[in-house]
Curated annotation (Swiss-Prot):
Belongs to the class-II aminoacyl-tRNA synthetase family. Type 1 subfamily. Its EC number is 6.1.1.12. This is Aspartate--tRNA ligase. Residues 195-198 are annotated as: Aspartate. It comes from Hamiltonella defensa subsp. Acyrthosiphon pisum (strain 5AT). Keywords: Aminoacyl-tRNA synthetase, ATP-binding, Cytoplasm, Ligase, Nucleotide-binding, Protein biosynthesis. InterPro entries: Aa-tRNA-synt_II, aa-tRNA-synth_II, aa-tRNA-synth_II/BPL/LPL, Asp-tRNA-ligase_1, Asp-tRNA-ligase_1_N, Asp/Asn-tRNA-synth_IIb, AspRS_core, GAD-like_sf. GO terms for cellular component: cytoplasm. L-aspartate binds at E171, R217, H448, R489. Catalyzes the attachment of L-aspartate to tRNA(Asp) in a two-step reaction: L-aspartate is first activated by ATP to form Asp-AMP and then transferred to the acceptor end of tRNA(Asp).
Amino acid sequence: MRTHCCGELSLSVLNQTVCLCGWVDRRRDLGGLIFIDMRDFSGIVQVFFDPEQQALFEQASSLRNEFCIQITGKVKARPHHQINQKMLTGAVEVFSENLTIINCSEPLPLDRNQNNTEEQRLRYRYLDLRRPEMLARLKTRSKITSFVRQFLDKEGFLDVETPTLTKATPEGARDYLVPSRVQKGKFYALPQSPQLFKQLLMVSGVDRYYQIVKCFRDEDLRADRQPEFTQIDIETSFMTAQQVRTVTEKLIRQLWLQIKNIHLGAFPVMTFEEAIRRFGSDKPDLRNPLELVDLDDVLKNVDFKVFSEPANDAHSRVVGIRVPNGADISRKQIDEYTAFVHIYAARGLAWLKIKQADAGLEGIQSPIAKFLSPEILERILKRTQAKDGDLLFFGADKKKIVTDAMGALRLKLGLDRQLTQLDRWAPLWVIDFPMFSNDTETGLTAMHHPFTSPKNTNLSEFAANPETALANAYDMVINGYEVGGGSVRIHHSDLQQQVFSLIGIEANQQKQQFGFLLEALKYGAPPHAGIAFGLDRLVMLLTGTNNIRDVIAFPKTTAAACLMTDAPSFASDSSLQELFIDVVKKEKK
């Protein structure tokens, strides 16, 4: 139906007759002349209709935005003063010789100026995707997946598909369950990840596996989460954690070079402990220069219980954040920051402005100044490296509260004070995660997943101190986003059973849910390790959006609904009967 795409036209096809198909992006009537901007997936070109061709001109006058049309015409050079430098095709235009209206369009339910709610955009997604920036993101996504496949193929990885209908296993989030019509009363689960199958592929001798795969998690959603999402899933045999990091760092560095023409350089490596201590997060945004500074030892003996009590408690923490040139922050703004940390259960936010550092207590402004001695103030200023004109914020409470609250405050201050270098890329590896987290109600839970190997695989030593065990795990973080996470896996059945037992999975449950894995590990399972990257999150970063729904063609809302198709929907009684399912209506209290 066409010889060229709209965005391809240039002076190289001057005076050639072309046939184009696409949509009317805009029609302009200028002093008896009609011009349209014609758009397809490749771009926009200007089309001119000559009023001397009366029938064609009258036909063109009926065109409206988003009519689907076919144009045949000759490519002409625009007069020099009419060249549009903002368009790739701005040096040429098409003199129309024939117009076919393929399909008309009703007035759009979306605002052409893009002042649309997200609900409108999702309800009419097929129209929202016509916008050039949305199509550009889909093109970038396609380039990314194509590059990843080529890279991994060259590195000797084998693309293997794993089942979508599988067995429910506890992996952290709730499963999406699919009832079986054939097996009465039984359910499949949609995979939260191909974790167990890719480990079984290693037992099978596949050696190097990858898959770009859909995963499903029934969890509460955020701006960067979806109930169905896509992973770049990787697993290897006979490779160490360092070797996995090396090959996947190479992948990401080359990907950034391919898509953004940016050299990332070698990724720094940071332990989990250091990340939490300095940045209040296990996915630190290193574009932000602010850090959390521990002050426990400095404030242990201060005559101020808000500081001294947590400073002397092993389960608590006192930290400071130095805001360069922050003394101009108003009391109203300080109150707003105090309200902000309340979100994270912090009880308050102490502050101190440095007017003249070498003037001692006379040189500061702070409601806590009366509790500080000149010696303690000097130690605070030295530890935080505070200077004239700076502001210090203090957090003091249980470790988790302080870490979460001050870590979040650090990020907010970085943006508010324009300290975060938004034009930078700051990747890193975070390693040496705790093997388990300890919940007062549920006991030990796996920090990553229960198939991660501890760094120390000595069974007796591991069993003696599981709370202090480190996982042989690693996360890749870019600009504060965890883009990938992986680990060395357990490849001995007895160690796997021990980990299951530690997190409260009893022997019978182990056999019922993971018997196939425990059995497979007994048949010469090789050492293996892997990683998974969130494709949606990578595309989000590489296209410069902060909403993951912008990089998925047909995403769900935060209520896990598709507004366009009205999914999920009710099933008919006959369908439910076939599946042996009764829907029980909850009685109103």
